[in-house]
UniProtKB/Swiss-Prot annotation:
This is Large ribosomal subunit protein uL1. It comes from Desulforudis audaxviator (strain MP104C). PROSITE patterns: RIBOSOMAL_L1. Part of the 50S ribosomal subunit. GO terms for biological process: regulation of translation; translation. The gene is rplA. GO terms for molecular function: rRNA binding; structural constituent of ribosome; tRNA binding.
């Protein structure tokens, strides 16, 4: 278990680890207790009542946060023909076809999101073993395999995030920065939770939304009362 620094320990003392805080109170605590000098990311960890070992209990998708994440995301688009121009006009940072595949095979990875047109997926499939483990493989479920390139790029630039349940049944997602007004963090969190509820697998049994913890990059976790989201 990693040893925490003095600032973290002092911040953690101000959080009741047994208490489930109301949403706004929890987010205000996270902002107040963020110990680092840089603008830390605020993240939500959501525990879901699913068994990810079963294919019919996977939770995966994407959602546009109304206030974005506070981070400028670098977008790579795999495209050819007129779609190259469309991607460039939409604000994609890198656009290309087979040459981009070769570049990634050579070790280049300077992007946060990859989008591809369907006719490029056979080429992109060659680097699936590189992109997949990093969560960068374009996928129709997250809207990153599409011919509507302009919309896909615009959504990512506007604050679209992807989410995917891990082996323990948790979703980890950024919801902003500690510099955000608490109302904006709250709206982003609500948008994320609403998306997760809509994505509930039919095979999921029992309580679905089992817990929410919000934290900053370097700060302690604060438990959130889930009643507001399931009421």
């Amino acid at each position: 278990m990693p040893k925490h620094g003095k600032k973290y320990v002092e911040a953690a003392k101000q959080v009741d680890s047994e208490k489930q805080y109301e949403v706004r109170e929890a987010l205000e605590l996270v902002r107040k207790l963020a110990p680092a000098k840089f603008d830390e990311t605020v993240e939500a960890a959501v525990k879901l009542g699913v068994d990810p070992r079963h294919a019919d209990q996977q939770v995966r998708g994407a959602v546009v946060l109304p206030h974005g994440t506070g981070k400028t995301r670098t977008v790579l688009v795999f495209a050819k023909g007129e779609k190259v121009t469309e991607a460039e006009k939409a604000g994609a940072d890198y656009v290309g076809g087979e040459e981009m595949v070769a570049k990634i095979q050579g070790g280049w990875m300077e992007f946060d999101v990859a989008i591809a047109t369907p006719d490029m997926m056979s080429a992109v499939g060659k680097i699936g073993r590189i992109l997949g483990p990093r969560g960068l493989m374009p996928n129709p479920k997250t809207g990153t395999v599409t011919f509507d390139i302009a919309r896909a790029v615009a959504e990512v630039k506007a604050g679209k995030i992807q989410y995917r349940v891990d082996k323990a049944g948790n979703i980890h997602a950024p919801i902003g920065k500690v510099s955000f007004e608490v109302e904006k963090l709250e709206e982003n969190l609500k948008t994320l939770i609403d998306a997760l509820i809509r994505a509930k697998p039919a095979a999921a049994k029992g309580q679905y939304l089992r817990g929410i913890v919000v934290t900053s990059t370097m700060g302690p976790g604060v438990r959130v009362n889930t009643r507001k989201f399931i009421g």
